[in-house]
């Protein structure tokens, strides 16, 4: 079994974590990644190396996602060179918030289901920092909207996976905290089932040791959704501009509306393919799926809007409800089908 501990500017708790794992899981191979902490923290890393951990070092801070990728790449080289069979990997935070018994539970879950991505899920009861509780609710809700799958703890750092998943893990986007969320988003699309095992919720000193930056890292985590929203707004601007220009040139409203929609839809398709989703299938195939989706959404828009107005909802409110629902549906379908 491999245990990965990414660390940035740690304290003495890192040493305690490594000591506890070494004592209670003596066969585990511990990999600590120094993510550019600086010379002032070398004593902590030297001590973990003395205890028996392998320490990998980034010259500068690259982010948690990059630290995990560095560890995955190291493990892959070791597995290949030593001709090792599939092994469970468990990622653990450096601040002591993950208990040994929970690390063992996650590892056992991977041994039983090696194709799964296993999450150590906290219950979020008791004294949980407000930002942690709120952040997890937002990301869990967004994840469920996008994938249709319920995950109770999207931000857990205690995760398990098999070494067989390393090639997939190394190809995921993101180098900071968004990497872990991207891992969840891409798991279902790639055919890797997500499962959870309950773990004890532990927060030390109100989670002050966390290097999560609420604004900057939240933007990174939600960037796929924000990019999708941005392309939708830009497409609307293109649609309106094209409509006015075409109508001024042709004086034909129907032709102008149709051509403007074709131009804006084509623009959004290209933007979503190259900026938001990065599909594995060909652009032609994705484009065909996209325009089929556009036609379906257009029909749904009409029927849903007319139905809401028919039951007495005002046109403005009905339009708002319709566009919001179809926006979420569109994102989910494009993520899971159109640009898969």
Segments from the language model and where they lie:
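Conserved donor nucleotide-binding strand/loop of the catalytic core
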Residues: 45-88
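Short, well-formed alpha-helical segments that are part of the catalytic scaffolds
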Residues: 9-23, 40
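Cell-envelope/extracellular polymer assembly enzymes that use nucleotide-activated donors
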Residues: 1-2, 29, 182
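A conserved acidic beta->alpha catalytic loop
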Residues: 34-44, 60, 96
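Acceptor/aglycone-binding surface of glycosyltransferases and processive sugar-polymer synthases
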Residues: 54, 60, 66-74, 100-177, ...
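Conserved short acidic donor-positioning loop in nucleotide-sugar-dependent glycosyltransferases
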Residues: 9, 35-37, 62, 71
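Acidic donor-binding/catalytic loop of UDP-sugar-dependent glycosyltransferases
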Residues: 39-40, 85-86, 92-109
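Hydrophobic helical membrane-anchoring modules
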Residues: 11, 172-248, 265, 269-296, ...
